[in-house]
Curated annotation (Swiss-Prot):
Pfam families: Glycos_transf_1
Keywords, comma-separated and alphabetical: Glycosyltransferase, Transferase
Membrane spanning stretches: none
Family of this protein: Belongs to the glycosyltransferase group 1 family. Glycosyltransferase 4 subfamily.
Organism: Sulfolobus islandicus rod-shaped virus 1 (SIRV-1)
Molecular function per GO: glycosyltransferase activity
Protein name from the UniProt record: Uncharacterized glycosyltransferase 335
């Protein structure tokens, strides 16, 4: 069977599309990936995978509508979408496959049809390659920052990511707990604009977001002692699951959709202190952004730096992540 996958150029979206294609090819399908909604290669099946981003949705919906053959529309939705700016005719007969129960709820909130969710998965071939990088990365980190605990963050800078709160965490940890801060270092992969912020000496900008291979990002997760995911709303939250697959415990808020796949026992979860509603015009969504108290995040970081069971946590998280193998989850697209 010839299959076309229509997607977007965001790195996280492209990665999932490549994984879907890999599973389909292993099962005998001939797959072409396109990022142009105005040109769909000849195919018997079409899979659209894009974020539910109302301002840019119409061309993709039209391509889906026009396609004659089997078709599936897979999506992620971080908040309640504004469908007033979307062509209602093109929406009416689409049954969306969400990537989480949370994405499904956001779509259902505005009356859209949803199928059973297909969680994002882990490509364990990439994990295997990334694990080969980890010893070298750890060796360099231990040489440059001996006898310290390393915390990693991979995050964009949109409002919902809560990186503004992390800047406060960095500063308060260093001012209120200087002795503890001496043994802690933070390593950040983010957008270049992050470097415009004044941060303490133990906060290091490692690389620009979206410009590294997947193996490098997974290797980065594996080289850290802990990963922090400060985000306040996500359609899914791949950094949490990817870190788990590399055996690195994650500090994150207890909130949907993380609570659909995280480990309450082996990750470190902090409570949300409030939920802020914010309409983002650029994304055409109303976000419910979970916020945490600065002190709660600091306490979680300090607790993590003192834990004695980090290796047990690592083993358990790797075991849990195996449930989310792309070769099991993405067989849904073979239908």
């Amino acid at each position: 069977m010839k299959t076309a996958i229509l997607t977007m150029n965001y790195s996280s979206i492209s990665n999932v599309s490549e994984d879907i294609a890999e599973v389909l090819r292993e099962n005998g399908e001939i797959v072409t990936i396109t990022k142009n909604p105005f040109y769909i290669p000849k195919a018997e099946k079409l899979i659209v995978f894009i974020p539910f981003h109302p301002p840019s949705l119409n061309p993709y919906l039209y391509a889906f509508y026009q396609f004659n053959g089997k078709k599936l529309f897979y999506t992620t939705c971080d908040g309640i979408p504004n469908i007033e700016i979307v062509n209602k005719y093109l929406l009416q007969d689409v049954k969306f496959i969400p990537n989480s129960k949370f994405s499904a709820m956001n779509l259902q909130e505005v009356g859209l049809q949803t199928d059973l969710p297909v969680f994002h998965g882990i490509n364990f071939k990439i994990v295997e390659n990334a694990e080969k990088l980890v010893p070298q990365l750890k060796q360099k980190l231990d040489k440059d920052f001996p006898n310290t605990i390393k915390f990693g963050i991979v995050s964009g800078l949109t409002k919902r990511k809560n990186m503004d709160l992390m800047l406060q965490v960095f500063n308060e940890l260093n001012t209120k707990y200087p002795d503890i801060a001496k043994k802690i270092h933070f390593f950040v992969i983010s957008h270049k604009q992050f470097t415009q912020n004044e941060v303490p000496a133990n906060v290091h900008f490692v690389a620009e977001f979206g410009f590294n291979s997947r193996e490098y990002i997974f290797g980065f997760y594996g080289a850290m002692d802990y990963i922090i995911v400060p985000s306040g709303t996500e359609g899914f939250g791949m950094p949490v699951l990817e870190s788990m697959a590399m055996g690195t415990p994650v500090i994150h808020q207890l909130m949907p959709p993380f609570d659909e796949f995280t480990s309450w026992q082996w990750n470190l979860l902090i409570k949300s202190s409030k939920v802020e509603e914010y309409y983002d015009k650029e994304h055409g969504q109303k976000w419910k952004i979970h916020k945490f108290e600065i002190e709660d995040m600091i306490n979680a970081i300090i607790l993590a730096s003192e834990l004695q069971d980090r290796e047990e946590r690592s083993t358990k998280l790797k075991e849990l992540a195996k449930r989310y193998d792309i070769r099991n989850l993405y067989t849904r697209f073979l239908e």
